[in-house]
Amino acid sequence: MLLRSSGKLNVGTKKEDGESTAPTPRPKILRCKCHHHCPEDSVNNICSTDGYCFTMIEEDDSGMPVVTSGCLGLEGSDFQCRDTPIPHQRRSIECCTERNECNKDLHPTLPPLKDRDFVDGPIHHKALLISVTVCSLLLVLIILFCYFRYKRQEARPRYSIGLEQDETYIPPGESLRDLIEQSQSSGSGSGLPLLVQRTIAKQIQMVKQIGKGRYGEVWMGKWRGEKVAVKVFFTTEEASWFRETEIYQTVLMRHENILGFIAADIKGTGSWTQLYLITDYHENGSLYDYLKSTTLDAKSMLKLAYSSVSGLCHLHTEIFSTQGKPAIAHRDLKSKNILVKKNGTCCIADLGLAVKFISDTNEVDIPPNTRVGTKRYMPPEVLDESLNRNHFQSYIMADMYSFGLILWEIARRCVSGGIVEEYQLPYHDLVPSDPSYEDMREIVCMKKLRPSFPNRWSSDECLRQMGKLMTECWAQNPASRLTALRVKKTLAKMSESQDIKL
Protein backbone atom coordinates (compact mmCIF):
# COMPACT_ATOMS: atom_id res chain seq x y z
CA MET A 1 0.00 0.00 0.00
CA LEU A 2 1.18 3.56 -0.78
CA LEU A 3 0.17 6.45 1.48
CA ARG A 4 1.30 9.48 -0.49
CA SER A 5 -0.27 12.16 1.66
CA SER A 6 2.20 11.88 4.56
CA GLY A 7 5.26 12.76 2.48
CA LYS A 8 3.77 15.62 0.51
CA LEU A 9 1.96 17.35 3.35
CA ASN A 10 4.55 17.23 6.08
CA VAL A 11 7.95 17.37 4.42
CA GLY A 12 9.21 20.55 2.69
CA THR A 13 11.06 20.49 -0.65
CA LYS A 14 14.42 22.07 -1.54
CA LYS A 15 15.24 24.18 -4.56
CA GLU A 16 18.32 23.30 -6.59
CA ASP A 17 20.29 26.14 -4.95
CA GLY A 18 19.61 24.58 -1.55
CA GLU A 19 16.98 27.03 -0.27
CA SER A 20 14.06 25.39 1.41
CA THR A 21 10.43 26.20 0.67
CA ALA A 22 7.34 25.82 2.86
CA PRO A 23 5.15 22.77 2.31
CA THR A 24 2.15 23.13 0.04
CA PRO A 25 -0.90 23.90 2.23
CA ARG A 26 -3.54 21.15 2.32
CA PRO A 27 -7.03 22.17 1.13
CA LYS A 28 -9.57 22.14 3.99
CA ILE A 29 -12.13 20.46 1.77
CA LEU A 30 -10.64 18.09 -0.74
CA ARG A 31 -12.34 17.18 -4.02
CA CYS A 32 -11.66 13.70 -5.33
CA LYS A 33 -12.46 11.75 -8.49
CA CYS A 34 -14.92 8.94 -7.70
CA HIS A 35 -15.65 5.74 -9.55
CA HIS A 36 -17.74 2.84 -8.18
CA HIS A 37 -17.67 4.70 -4.85
CA CYS A 38 -19.59 7.97 -5.52
CA PRO A 39 -21.91 9.33 -2.81
CA GLU A 40 -25.42 10.52 -3.77
CA ASP A 41 -24.42 14.23 -3.60
CA SER A 42 -21.47 13.81 -6.00
CA VAL A 43 -21.48 15.82 -9.25
CA ASN A 44 -19.68 14.73 -12.42
CA ASN A 45 -17.97 11.90 -10.53
CA ILE A 46 -16.47 14.38 -8.05
CA CYS A 47 -16.91 13.94 -4.26
CA SER A 48 -15.79 16.13 -1.36
CA THR A 49 -14.10 15.12 1.93
CA ASP A 50 -12.13 16.48 4.87
CA GLY A 51 -9.92 13.38 4.72
CA TYR A 52 -8.24 11.60 1.81
CA CYS A 53 -8.72 10.76 -1.83
CA PHE A 54 -8.11 7.10 -2.67
CA THR A 55 -7.83 4.72 -5.57
CA MET A 56 -8.09 0.96 -4.98
CA ILE A 57 -7.70 -2.09 -7.19
CA GLU A 58 -8.96 -5.57 -6.21
CA GLU A 59 -9.93 -8.88 -7.77
CA ASP A 60 -13.60 -9.82 -8.07
CA ASP A 61 -14.96 -13.38 -7.68
CA SER A 62 -14.05 -14.21 -11.29
CA GLY A 63 -10.45 -13.06 -10.81
CA MET A 64 -10.86 -9.85 -12.88
CA PRO A 65 -9.30 -6.58 -11.56
CA VAL A 66 -11.77 -3.84 -10.54
CA VAL A 67 -10.66 -0.22 -9.91
CA THR A 68 -12.52 1.90 -7.35
CA SER A 69 -11.83 5.52 -6.39
CA GLY A 70 -13.45 8.10 -4.16
CA CYS A 71 -13.36 9.95 -0.85
CA LEU A 72 -12.43 8.79 2.67
CA GLY A 73 -13.50 10.76 5.73
CA LEU A 74 -10.78 12.09 8.01
CA GLU A 75 -11.77 9.84 10.91
CA GLY A 76 -10.34 6.36 10.40
CA SER A 77 -8.71 7.20 7.06
CA ASP A 78 -5.20 6.42 8.28
CA PHE A 79 -6.31 2.91 9.20
CA GLN A 80 -8.10 2.38 5.88
CA CYS A 81 -5.18 3.71 3.85
CA ARG A 82 -2.85 1.35 5.69
CA ASP A 83 -4.80 -1.53 4.21
CA THR A 84 -4.37 -4.78 6.17
CA PRO A 85 -3.90 -7.74 3.81
CA ILE A 86 -6.76 -10.24 3.86
CA PRO A 87 -5.84 -13.91 3.25
CA HIS A 88 -6.88 -15.20 -0.20
CA GLN A 89 -7.95 -11.66 -1.35
CA ARG A 90 -5.68 -9.60 -3.66
CA ARG A 91 -6.11 -5.84 -3.46
CA SER A 92 -4.11 -2.61 -3.14
CA ILE A 93 -5.08 0.94 -2.11
CA GLU A 94 -3.30 4.31 -2.42
CA CYS A 95 -4.34 7.58 -0.75
CA CYS A 96 -3.41 11.24 -1.25
CA THR A 97 -4.25 14.72 0.10
CA GLU A 98 -1.90 17.17 -1.67
CA ARG A 99 -4.43 18.65 -4.11
CA ASN A 100 -7.92 18.30 -5.49
CA GLU A 101 -8.51 15.24 -7.66
CA CYS A 102 -5.03 14.01 -6.79
CA ASN A 103 -6.26 10.41 -6.92
CA LYS A 104 -6.65 10.49 -10.68
CA ASP A 105 -2.87 10.23 -10.80
CA LEU A 106 -2.83 7.21 -8.46
CA HIS A 107 -2.35 3.84 -10.18
CA PRO A 108 -2.14 1.08 -7.57
CA THR A 109 -1.26 -2.40 -8.81
CA LEU A 110 -2.34 -5.78 -7.52
CA PRO A 111 0.21 -7.44 -5.24
CA PRO A 112 2.13 -10.29 -6.89
CA LEU A 113 0.55 -13.73 -6.75
CA LYS A 114 1.78 -16.10 -4.04
CA ASP A 115 2.09 -19.80 -4.81
CA ARG A 116 -1.21 -20.68 -3.19
CA ASP A 117 -3.02 -17.84 -5.00
CA PHE A 118 -2.63 -19.59 -8.34
CA VAL A 119 -5.26 -22.13 -7.28
CA ASP A 120 -7.93 -19.50 -6.60
CA GLY A 121 -10.91 -19.00 -8.85
CA PRO A 122 -12.21 -21.70 -11.19
CA ILE A 123 -8.94 -23.65 -11.06
CA HIS A 124 -9.15 -23.72 -7.27
CA HIS A 125 -12.69 -25.10 -7.35
CA LYS A 126 -11.68 -27.75 -9.85
CA ALA A 127 -8.69 -28.80 -7.75
CA LEU A 128 -10.87 -28.86 -4.64
CA LEU A 129 -13.44 -31.05 -6.40
CA ILE A 130 -10.75 -33.49 -7.53
CA SER A 131 -9.23 -33.61 -4.03
CA VAL A 132 -12.58 -34.28 -2.35
CA THR A 133 -13.41 -37.00 -4.89
CA VAL A 134 -10.06 -38.76 -4.42
CA CYS A 135 -10.30 -38.54 -0.60
CA SER A 136 -13.86 -39.91 -0.68
CA LEU A 137 -12.78 -42.86 -2.82
CA LEU A 138 -9.88 -43.59 -0.50
CA LEU A 139 -12.18 -43.42 2.53
CA VAL A 140 -14.65 -45.84 0.92
CA LEU A 141 -11.81 -48.25 0.08
CA ILE A 142 -10.48 -48.11 3.65
CA ILE A 143 -13.96 -48.74 5.10
CA LEU A 144 -14.50 -51.69 2.73
CA PHE A 145 -11.10 -53.13 3.63
CA CYS A 146 -11.81 -52.86 7.37
CA TYR A 147 -15.30 -54.33 6.93
CA PHE A 148 -14.15 -57.40 4.99
CA ARG A 149 -11.27 -57.94 7.38
CA TYR A 150 -13.70 -57.76 10.30
CA LYS A 151 -16.13 -60.20 8.64
CA ARG A 152 -13.30 -62.62 7.91
CA GLN A 153 -12.24 -62.46 11.56
CA GLU A 154 -15.83 -62.93 12.71
CA ALA A 155 -16.12 -66.03 10.53
CA ARG A 156 -13.47 -67.71 12.67
CA PRO A 157 -14.47 -69.12 16.10
CA ARG A 158 -14.56 -66.01 18.24
CA TYR A 159 -12.76 -67.56 21.15
CA SER A 160 -10.64 -70.08 19.33
CA ILE A 161 -7.46 -71.06 21.06
CA GLY A 162 -4.65 -72.09 18.75
CA LEU A 163 -2.99 -75.47 18.58
CA GLU A 164 0.30 -74.00 17.44
CA GLN A 165 2.08 -74.57 20.73
CA ASP A 166 4.07 -77.63 21.64
CA GLU A 167 2.03 -80.44 23.16
CA THR A 168 5.05 -82.23 24.56
CA TYR A 169 4.37 -80.84 28.03
CA ILE A 170 1.33 -83.10 28.29
CA PRO A 171 1.88 -86.71 27.20
CA PRO A 172 -0.81 -88.18 24.91
CA GLY A 173 -3.48 -90.09 26.80
CA GLU A 174 -3.23 -88.00 29.97
CA SER A 175 -6.66 -86.90 31.24
CA LEU A 176 -7.39 -83.79 33.28
CA ARG A 177 -8.02 -85.95 36.34
CA ASP A 178 -4.61 -87.60 35.89
CA LEU A 179 -2.87 -84.25 35.61
CA ILE A 180 -4.61 -82.81 38.67
CA GLU A 181 -3.92 -85.90 40.77
CA GLN A 182 -0.25 -85.74 39.78
CA SER A 183 -0.04 -82.07 40.77
CA GLN A 184 -1.64 -82.82 44.15
CA SER A 185 0.64 -85.77 44.84
CA SER A 186 3.66 -83.62 43.93
CA GLY A 187 3.02 -81.68 47.13
CA SER A 188 2.49 -78.20 45.68
CA GLY A 189 -1.24 -78.20 46.39
CA SER A 190 -1.70 -75.05 44.32
CA GLY A 191 -2.92 -76.55 41.06
CA LEU A 192 -1.29 -77.46 37.77
CA PRO A 193 2.08 -75.97 36.78
CA LEU A 194 1.64 -72.72 34.85
CA LEU A 195 3.22 -74.17 31.71
CA VAL A 196 0.71 -77.03 31.74
CA GLN A 197 -2.14 -74.56 32.31
CA ARG A 198 -1.08 -72.48 29.31
CA THR A 199 -0.77 -75.58 27.14
CA ILE A 200 -4.26 -76.77 28.10
CA ALA A 201 -5.69 -73.28 27.49
CA LYS A 202 -4.21 -73.19 23.99
CA GLN A 203 -5.65 -76.62 23.15
CA ILE A 204 -9.23 -75.92 24.23
CA GLN A 205 -11.84 -76.12 21.47
CA MET A 206 -14.81 -73.83 22.13
CA VAL A 207 -18.16 -75.54 21.47
CA LYS A 208 -21.02 -73.24 22.54
CA GLN A 209 -21.85 -70.30 24.77
CA ILE A 210 -23.79 -71.38 27.86
CA GLY A 211 -24.00 -68.19 29.87
CA LYS A 212 -23.34 -64.47 30.03
CA GLY A 213 -23.00 -62.06 32.94
CA ARG A 214 -21.61 -58.71 33.96
CA TYR A 215 -18.08 -60.14 34.02
CA GLY A 216 -18.12 -61.79 30.55
CA GLU A 217 -19.25 -65.06 28.98
CA VAL A 218 -19.19 -68.76 29.86
CA TRP A 219 -18.53 -71.33 27.14
CA MET A 220 -18.62 -75.08 27.08
CA GLY A 221 -15.39 -76.30 25.54
CA LYS A 222 -13.53 -79.54 25.01
CA TRP A 223 -9.99 -80.64 25.75
CA ARG A 224 -9.03 -84.03 24.32
CA GLY A 225 -12.70 -84.98 24.30
CA GLU A 226 -13.37 -83.91 27.92
CA LYS A 227 -15.94 -81.18 28.54
CA VAL A 228 -14.73 -78.10 30.38
CA ALA A 229 -16.23 -74.72 31.25
CA VAL A 230 -14.37 -71.65 29.96
CA LYS A 231 -15.12 -68.33 31.61
CA VAL A 232 -14.09 -65.52 29.22
CA PHE A 233 -13.76 -62.24 31.10
CA PHE A 234 -14.28 -58.79 29.57
CA THR A 235 -11.01 -56.84 29.60
CA THR A 236 -12.68 -54.37 31.99
CA GLU A 237 -13.00 -57.23 34.50
CA GLU A 238 -9.30 -58.08 34.64
CA ALA A 239 -9.25 -57.47 38.41
CA SER A 240 -11.95 -60.14 38.88
CA TRP A 241 -10.09 -62.58 36.62
CA PHE A 242 -6.83 -62.01 38.48
CA ARG A 243 -8.44 -62.37 41.91
CA GLU A 244 -10.37 -65.52 41.04
CA THR A 245 -7.27 -67.11 39.51
CA GLU A 246 -5.24 -66.16 42.58
CA ILE A 247 -7.82 -67.65 44.97
CA TYR A 248 -8.21 -70.89 42.99
CA GLN A 249 -4.44 -71.36 43.00
CA THR A 250 -4.22 -70.94 46.76
CA VAL A 251 -2.49 -73.87 48.42
CA LEU A 252 -4.91 -76.61 49.61
CA MET A 253 -7.84 -74.84 47.95
CA ARG A 254 -9.10 -77.90 46.05
CA HIS A 255 -12.26 -79.39 47.59
CA GLU A 256 -15.10 -81.47 46.17
CA ASN A 257 -17.59 -78.70 46.99
CA ILE A 258 -15.59 -75.88 45.43
CA LEU A 259 -15.60 -75.62 41.64
CA GLY A 260 -12.61 -77.52 40.26
CA PHE A 261 -10.03 -75.18 38.76
CA ILE A 262 -8.08 -76.39 35.72
CA ALA A 263 -6.22 -73.48 34.12
CA ALA A 264 -6.04 -69.73 33.55
CA ASP A 265 -4.44 -67.82 30.72
CA ILE A 266 -4.34 -64.46 28.94
CA LYS A 267 -4.41 -64.59 25.17
CA GLY A 268 -4.00 -61.62 22.84
CA THR A 269 -5.41 -61.81 19.31
CA GLY A 270 -4.35 -58.37 18.13
CA SER A 271 -7.72 -56.64 18.19
CA TRP A 272 -8.65 -57.75 21.72
CA THR A 273 -7.27 -59.51 24.78
CA GLN A 274 -9.01 -62.59 26.15
CA LEU A 275 -8.86 -63.59 29.81
CA TYR A 276 -9.61 -67.30 30.31
CA LEU A 277 -10.53 -69.22 33.43
CA ILE A 278 -11.00 -72.94 32.73
CA THR A 279 -12.87 -75.09 35.26
CA ASP A 280 -14.83 -78.32 35.55
CA TYR A 281 -18.03 -78.38 33.51
CA HIS A 282 -21.35 -79.16 35.25
CA GLU A 283 -24.24 -79.57 32.84
CA ASN A 284 -26.93 -78.96 35.50
CA GLY A 285 -25.79 -75.35 35.62
CA SER A 286 -26.27 -73.10 38.63
CA LEU A 287 -28.39 -73.84 41.68
CA TYR A 288 -30.65 -71.01 40.50
CA ASP A 289 -31.27 -72.75 37.15
CA TYR A 290 -31.62 -76.15 38.81
CA LEU A 291 -34.23 -75.02 41.35
CA LYS A 292 -36.32 -73.32 38.67
CA SER A 293 -36.79 -76.61 36.83
CA THR A 294 -36.51 -79.24 39.58
CA THR A 295 -38.55 -80.09 42.68
CA LEU A 296 -36.87 -81.76 45.66
CA ASP A 297 -37.56 -84.35 48.30
CA ALA A 298 -36.08 -84.15 51.80
CA LYS A 299 -32.99 -86.13 50.80
CA SER A 300 -32.11 -84.04 47.73
CA MET A 301 -32.82 -80.83 49.69
CA LEU A 302 -30.44 -81.82 52.48
CA LYS A 303 -27.87 -82.99 49.94
CA LEU A 304 -27.86 -79.60 48.18
CA ALA A 305 -27.73 -77.69 51.47
CA TYR A 306 -25.07 -79.88 53.12
CA SER A 307 -22.72 -79.91 50.13
CA SER A 308 -23.06 -76.13 49.70
CA VAL A 309 -22.22 -75.38 53.32
CA SER A 310 -19.36 -77.91 53.19
CA GLY A 311 -17.75 -75.88 50.42
CA LEU A 312 -18.38 -72.65 52.32
CA CYS A 313 -16.94 -74.19 55.49
CA HIS A 314 -13.75 -75.14 53.62
CA LEU A 315 -13.46 -71.58 52.30
CA HIS A 316 -13.94 -70.04 55.74
CA THR A 317 -11.51 -72.40 57.49
CA GLU A 318 -7.84 -71.60 57.89
CA ILE A 319 -5.60 -74.66 57.63
CA PHE A 320 -2.38 -74.57 59.63
CA SER A 321 0.48 -76.60 58.17
CA THR A 322 3.78 -76.17 56.37
CA GLN A 323 1.68 -75.33 53.30
CA GLY A 324 -1.32 -73.82 55.02
CA LYS A 325 -4.49 -72.33 53.56
CA PRO A 326 -5.74 -68.90 54.62
CA ALA A 327 -9.34 -68.32 55.66
CA ILE A 328 -11.35 -66.96 52.71
CA ALA A 329 -14.72 -65.16 52.62
CA HIS A 330 -16.73 -65.30 49.38
CA ARG A 331 -18.51 -61.89 49.48
CA ASP A 332 -20.92 -62.67 46.62
CA LEU A 333 -22.78 -65.80 47.68
CA LYS A 334 -26.02 -66.43 45.79
CA SER A 335 -27.76 -69.32 44.04
CA LYS A 336 -26.31 -68.23 40.69
CA ASN A 337 -22.78 -68.66 42.06
CA ILE A 338 -23.31 -72.25 43.21
CA LEU A 339 -23.23 -75.07 40.65
CA VAL A 340 -25.04 -78.42 40.82
CA LYS A 341 -23.09 -81.58 39.95
CA LYS A 342 -24.45 -84.70 38.28
CA ASN A 343 -24.67 -86.49 41.64
CA GLY A 344 -26.95 -83.82 43.13
CA THR A 345 -24.30 -82.13 45.25
CA CYS A 346 -23.16 -78.52 44.96
CA CYS A 347 -19.90 -76.68 44.50
CA ILE A 348 -19.22 -73.00 45.12
CA ALA A 349 -18.02 -70.86 42.20
CA ASP A 350 -17.22 -67.24 41.24
CA LEU A 351 -14.49 -66.18 43.65
CA GLY A 352 -13.75 -62.86 41.94
CA LEU A 353 -14.67 -60.85 45.05
CA ALA A 354 -13.20 -63.21 47.65
CA VAL A 355 -11.20 -61.77 50.54
CA LYS A 356 -8.34 -63.59 52.33
CA PHE A 357 -7.22 -63.37 55.94
CA ILE A 358 -3.46 -63.47 56.54
CA SER A 359 -3.30 -64.57 60.18
CA ASP A 360 0.48 -64.09 60.49
CA THR A 361 0.10 -60.35 59.98
CA ASN A 362 -3.57 -60.13 61.03
CA GLU A 363 -4.21 -58.56 57.62
CA VAL A 364 -7.42 -58.62 55.57
CA ASP A 365 -6.44 -59.01 51.90
CA ILE A 366 -9.22 -57.23 49.97
CA PRO A 367 -9.04 -57.33 46.15
CA PRO A 368 -8.56 -53.99 44.33
CA ASN A 369 -11.84 -54.40 42.47
CA THR A 370 -14.55 -51.85 41.67
CA ARG A 371 -17.13 -54.63 41.38
CA VAL A 372 -19.53 -55.07 44.30
CA GLY A 373 -21.71 -57.97 45.40
CA THR A 374 -25.37 -58.61 44.58
CA LYS A 375 -27.67 -56.14 46.35
CA ARG A 376 -30.49 -58.67 46.91
CA TYR A 377 -28.16 -60.88 48.99
CA MET A 378 -26.37 -58.12 50.91
CA PRO A 379 -26.61 -58.29 54.72
CA PRO A 380 -27.85 -55.29 56.73
CA GLU A 381 -24.35 -54.28 57.84
CA VAL A 382 -23.25 -53.94 54.20
CA LEU A 383 -26.40 -52.07 53.17
CA ASP A 384 -26.13 -49.55 56.01
CA GLU A 385 -22.32 -49.40 55.67
CA SER A 386 -21.68 -50.38 59.28
CA LEU A 387 -19.51 -53.41 58.40
CA ASN A 388 -16.03 -53.28 59.94
CA ARG A 389 -13.80 -53.71 56.87
CA ASN A 390 -10.70 -54.36 58.95
CA HIS A 391 -12.25 -57.27 60.84
CA PHE A 392 -12.21 -60.51 58.81
CA GLN A 393 -14.97 -62.13 60.87
CA SER A 394 -17.33 -59.43 59.54
CA TYR A 395 -16.99 -60.88 56.02
CA ILE A 396 -17.53 -64.43 57.30
CA MET A 397 -20.78 -63.41 59.00
CA ALA A 398 -21.89 -61.51 55.89
CA ASP A 399 -21.50 -64.77 53.92
CA MET A 400 -23.69 -66.58 56.46
CA TYR A 401 -26.53 -64.07 55.98
CA SER A 402 -26.42 -64.71 52.22
CA PHE A 403 -26.29 -68.47 52.79
CA GLY A 404 -29.46 -68.25 54.91
CA LEU A 405 -31.28 -66.81 51.86
CA ILE A 406 -29.94 -69.67 49.71
CA LEU A 407 -31.31 -72.20 52.22
CA TRP A 408 -34.71 -70.50 51.86
CA GLU A 409 -34.55 -70.85 48.05
CA ILE A 410 -33.73 -74.58 48.39
CA ALA A 411 -36.38 -75.35 51.02
CA ARG A 412 -39.22 -73.74 49.02
CA ARG A 413 -38.68 -76.34 46.28
CA CYS A 414 -38.96 -79.31 48.66
CA VAL A 415 -42.26 -81.17 48.28
CA SER A 416 -44.21 -81.98 51.47
CA GLY A 417 -47.76 -83.29 51.55
CA GLY A 418 -47.84 -83.02 47.77
CA ILE A 419 -47.35 -79.23 47.96
CA VAL A 420 -44.45 -77.18 46.64
CA GLU A 421 -43.97 -73.48 45.89
CA GLU A 422 -42.72 -72.20 42.56
CA TYR A 423 -39.15 -70.97 42.55
CA GLN A 424 -38.67 -67.34 43.60
CA LEU A 425 -35.72 -65.17 44.51
CA PRO A 426 -35.46 -63.94 48.12
CA TYR A 427 -37.59 -60.82 48.77
CA HIS A 428 -39.39 -61.35 45.43
CA ASP A 429 -42.60 -60.00 46.96
CA LEU A 430 -40.98 -57.01 48.68
CA VAL A 431 -38.61 -55.40 46.15
CA PRO A 432 -38.45 -54.94 42.34
CA SER A 433 -36.67 -57.44 40.08
CA ASP A 434 -33.55 -55.25 40.07
CA PRO A 435 -33.64 -53.60 43.50
CA SER A 436 -31.61 -50.54 44.40
CA TYR A 437 -29.59 -50.08 47.59
CA GLU A 438 -32.40 -47.92 48.93
CA ASP A 439 -35.01 -50.64 48.23
CA MET A 440 -32.97 -53.27 50.08
CA ARG A 441 -31.95 -50.93 52.90
CA GLU A 442 -35.58 -50.07 53.64
CA ILE A 443 -36.69 -53.73 53.74
CA VAL A 444 -33.67 -55.34 55.44
CA CYS A 445 -32.34 -52.59 57.73
CA MET A 446 -35.23 -50.29 58.53
CA LYS A 447 -38.20 -52.68 58.48
CA LYS A 448 -36.00 -55.70 59.38
CA LEU A 449 -38.04 -57.98 57.15
CA ARG A 450 -36.94 -61.42 55.93
CA PRO A 451 -38.40 -63.91 53.41
CA SER A 452 -41.63 -65.48 54.68
CA PHE A 453 -42.17 -69.21 55.36
CA PRO A 454 -45.04 -71.17 53.77
CA ASN A 455 -47.56 -72.47 56.34
CA ARG A 456 -46.85 -76.08 55.36
CA TRP A 457 -43.34 -75.89 56.83
CA SER A 458 -44.75 -75.96 60.36
CA SER A 459 -46.25 -79.43 59.77
CA ASP A 460 -43.05 -80.93 58.31
CA GLU A 461 -40.25 -81.51 60.83
CA CYS A 462 -37.44 -81.34 58.29
CA LEU A 463 -38.70 -78.05 56.78
CA ARG A 464 -39.41 -76.64 60.24
CA GLN A 465 -35.79 -77.26 61.25
CA MET A 466 -34.59 -75.77 57.96
CA GLY A 467 -36.64 -72.65 58.73
CA LYS A 468 -35.06 -72.39 62.18
CA LEU A 469 -31.60 -72.83 60.66
CA MET A 470 -31.99 -70.10 58.06
CA THR A 471 -33.48 -67.73 60.65
CA GLU A 472 -30.32 -68.11 62.74
CA CYS A 473 -28.19 -67.48 59.64
CA TRP A 474 -29.83 -64.19 58.63
CA ALA A 475 -30.08 -62.66 62.13
CA GLN A 476 -29.92 -58.86 62.21
CA ASN A 477 -26.94 -58.94 64.56
CA PRO A 478 -23.93 -60.51 62.77
CA ALA A 479 -22.55 -61.89 66.04
CA SER A 480 -25.76 -63.93 66.51
CA ARG A 481 -25.46 -65.78 63.20
CA LEU A 482 -24.41 -69.40 62.95
CA THR A 483 -21.02 -70.30 61.51
CA ALA A 484 -20.68 -72.50 58.43
CA LEU A 485 -19.28 -75.31 60.59
CA ARG A 486 -22.28 -75.11 62.94
CA VAL A 487 -24.73 -75.24 60.01
CA LYS A 488 -22.82 -78.19 58.52
CA LYS A 489 -23.05 -80.15 61.79
CA THR A 490 -26.75 -79.32 62.19
CA LEU A 491 -27.56 -80.50 58.65
CA ALA A 492 -25.59 -83.71 59.27
CA LYS A 493 -27.69 -84.38 62.41
CA MET A 494 -30.90 -83.64 60.51
CA SER A 495 -29.90 -86.13 57.81
CA GLU A 496 -29.08 -88.74 60.43
CA SER A 497 -32.44 -88.26 62.16
CA GLN A 498 -34.21 -88.60 58.81
CA ASP A 499 -32.14 -91.74 58.12
CA ILE A 500 -30.68 -90.02 55.08
CA LYS A 501 -27.12 -90.84 54.05
CA LEU A 502 -25.36 -87.83 52.54
From Swiss-Prot:
Which segments sit on the Extracellular face?
14-126
Instruction: Say where the protein is mainly found.
Output: membrane
The alphabetized UniProt keywords are: ATP-binding, Cell membrane, Chondrogenesis, Disulfide bond, Kinase, Magnesium, Manganese, Membrane, Metal-binding, Nucleotide-binding, Receptor, Serine/threonine-protein kinase, Signal, Transferase, Transmembrane, Transmembrane helix
Q: Which GO terms describe its cellular component?
A: dendrite; neuronal cell body; plasma membrane
Uppermost EC category: transferase
TM ranges: 127-148
Annotated Protein kinase domain residues: 204-494
Membrane topology term reads: Single-pass type I membrane protein
Set out the biological process GO terms recorded for this chain's protein: BMP signaling pathway; bone development; camera-type eye development; cartilage condensation; cell differentiation; cell surface receptor protein serine/threonine kinase signaling pathway; cellular response to growth factor stimulus; central nervous system neuron differentiation
UniProt cross-references to InterPro entries, sorted A to Z: Activin_recp, GS_dom, Kinase-like_dom_sf, Prot_kinase_dom, Protein_kinase_ATP_BS, Ser-Thr/Tyr_kinase_cat_dom, Ser/Thr_kinase_AS, Snake_toxin-like_sf
Q: What is its EC number?
A: 2.7.11.30
What cofactor is needed?
Mg(2+); Mn(2+)
Q: Which residues form the active site?
A: 332 (proton acceptor)
Lineage, top-rank taxon, reads Eukaryota
According to the entry, every stretch annotated as the GS domain falls at 174-203
Q: Where is the signal peptide?
A: 1-13
Where is ATP annotated to bind?
A: 210-218, 231
Give all cystine bridges in this chain. Answer: 32-53, 34-38, 47-71, 81-95, 96-102
Q: Which PROSITE patterns match?
A: GS, PROTEIN_KINASE_ATP, PROTEIN_KINASE_DOM, PROTEIN_KINASE_ST
Compartments, as annotated in UniProt? Cell membrane
Family to which this protein belongs: Belongs to the protein kinase superfamily. TKL Ser/Thr protein kinase family. TGFB receptor subfamily.
Q: How does it assemble?
A: Interacts with high affinity with GDF5; positively regulates chondrocyte differentiation. Interacts with SCUBE3. Interacts with TSC22D1/TSC-22. Interacts with TGFBR3.
This chain's protein is named Bone morphogenetic protein receptor type-1B
